[in-house]
Amino acid sequence: MGLEKSLMLFPLLVLVLGLVQPSLGRESSAMKFERQHMDSAGTGSSPTYCNQMMMRREMTNGSCKPVNTFVHEPLAHVHAACSQKNVTCKNGKGNCYKSSSALHITDCRLKGNSKYPNCDYQTSNYQKRIIVACEGNPYVPVHLDASV
């Protein structure tokens, strides 16, 4: 009888695991934001910083991401932007917010003659405010919309 129950429950277990498993390895939007944009410990001062970081953060897999910005501030400072004055995002959505102060950032721009797999980036450092799109509960950055 115990074996019969186990055999009856097995298909149900397979169904549940099939539904749950794909989401286990999926990167959340907030985690992707951190991977692509946060480097609290870095300074971005090396001319090869962007080449190294874009590769390390998996933004040169299959193609070269044309533009990316790294923020060199504590994550809490970036999260704080989500409680600032609301601004319209570039895509017209209303979930963007501008940081209250300028932050240390590094812009990485793909050089014109650069082609995959040899992605070559120009590294530029700035002190600028950032505009981030925020979502979720807790309300956290999920997209870096601009630096101004």
UniProtKB/Swiss-Prot annotation:
Classification via SMART domains: RNAse_Pc (SM00092)
Main location: secreted
Localization in the cell: Secreted
Signal peptide: 1-25
Disulphide linkage map: 50-108, 64-119, 82-134, 89-96
Tissue: Pancreas.
Gene3D superfamilies: Ribonuclease A-like domain
Top-level taxon of origin: Eukaryota
Enzyme superclass (EC): lyase
Keywords associated with the record: Disulfide bond, Endonuclease, Hydrolase, Lyase, Nuclease, Secreted, Signal
Catalytic activities: an [RNA] containing cytidine + H2O = an [RNA]-3'-cytidine-3'-phosphate + a 5'-hydroxy-ribonucleotide-3'-[RNA]; an [RNA] containing uridine + H2O = an [RNA]-3'-uridine-3'-phosphate + a 5'-hydroxy-ribonucleotide-3'-[RNA]
EC number, as in UniProt: 4.6.1.18
Keyword Nuclease part of the UniProt annotation: yes
Residue positions binding substrate: 32, 35, 65-69, 90, 109
Example GO biological process: defense response to Gram-positive bacterium
Molecular function per GO: lyase activity; nucleic acid binding; ribonuclease A activity
Pfam family, one: RnaseA
Keyword Transport listed: no
Assembly and oligomerization: Monomer. Interacts with and forms tight 1:1 complexes with RNH1. Dimerization of two such complexes may occur. Interaction with RNH1 inhibits this protein.
Protein purpose: Endonuclease that catalyzes the cleavage of RNA on the 3' side of pyrimidine nucleotides. Acts on single-stranded and double-stranded RNA.
Protein name as catalogued: Ribonuclease pancreatic
Source organism: Gerbilliscus gambianus (Gambian gerbil)
Gene assigned in the entry: RNASE1
